[in-house]
């Protein structure tokens, strides 16, 4: 819930888009919210899904149609533990023109040396532009390959991370990089980071200290705006409540009542 709200508050997500993370104790499942605007997500909105994107327990709840994006990427990339799909207005011009999005300042190096493109037309012809079929999700995951970001022609972008905080960091700063690249192109020819600079700078930015500093900044901004999810005030997700309930049930079953004296 917090990651959704941070990315929305920083102007990347709007009423649409979604963020997920691989289940912390079961790599064969992932956690994703029900179909709701990211800035409104609460812990109780989070549900578990199999890697085939089937809900584990979400009867009567409207779900994201594009959840196959997440499941297919988790299947293809065991190293990935968090995924974000968005339609950032700063990134969309690159998705529309086909101009390469490259790191143009040091913080933008977290997107990699360049983001590859995926075009649904290449395999599926004219569609409704939504990635809702398993074969579409698999095709997108293939285009992502070993990269950290893939641009979806005429649609948006999908990013991944090895942790949720890394994903948030990469999502926010690739959005900023796109805005800076757009502005720079208006002035003239851009001078992006070299491959060597990007390969050295990206991992440096993703060290614990820089990420902790950024996370503190984002959460403080969110708190000051009064938009912190209930988890910031002690709330629990449905997945956490379910695990707690199962644990309580097991305890009640296995613990024998004491005899009265």
Placement of each model-derived feature along the sequence:
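Glycine-rich flexible loops
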Residues: 1-261
């Amino acid at each position: 819930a917090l990651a959704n709200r941070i990315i929305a508050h920083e102007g990347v997500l709007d009423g649409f888009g979604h963020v997920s993370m691989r289940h912390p104790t079961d790599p064969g499942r992932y956690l994703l919210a029900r179909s709701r605007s990211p800035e409104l997500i609460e812990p109780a909105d989070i549900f578990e899904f199999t890697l085939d994107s089937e809900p584990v327990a979400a009867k009567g709840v409207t779900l994201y149609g594009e959840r196959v994006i997440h499941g297919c990427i988790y299947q293809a990339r065991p190293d990935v533990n968090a995924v974000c799909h968005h339609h950032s207005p700063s990134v969309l011009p690159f998705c529309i023109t086909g101009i390469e999005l490259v790191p143009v300042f040091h913080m933008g190096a977290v997107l990699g040396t360049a983001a590859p493109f995926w075009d649904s037309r290449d395999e599926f012809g004219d569609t409704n532009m939504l990635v809702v079929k398993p074969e579409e999700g698999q095709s997108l995951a293939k285009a992502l390959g070993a990269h950290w970001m893939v641009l979806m022609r005429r649609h948006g972008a999908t990013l991944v991370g090895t942790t949720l905080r890394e994903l948030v960091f990469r999502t926010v700063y690739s959005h900023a990089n796109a805005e800076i690249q757009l502005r720079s192109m208006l002035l003239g020819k851009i001078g992006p980071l070299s491959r060597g600079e990007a390969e050295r700078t990206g991992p440096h930015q993703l060290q614990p200290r820089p990420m902790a500093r950024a996370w503190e900044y984002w959460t403080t901004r969110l708190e000051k705006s009064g938009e912190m999810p209930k988890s910031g005030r002690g709330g629990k997700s449905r997945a956490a409540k379910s695990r707690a309930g199962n644990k309580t049930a097991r305890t009640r079953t296995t613990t024998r009542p004491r005899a009265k004296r």
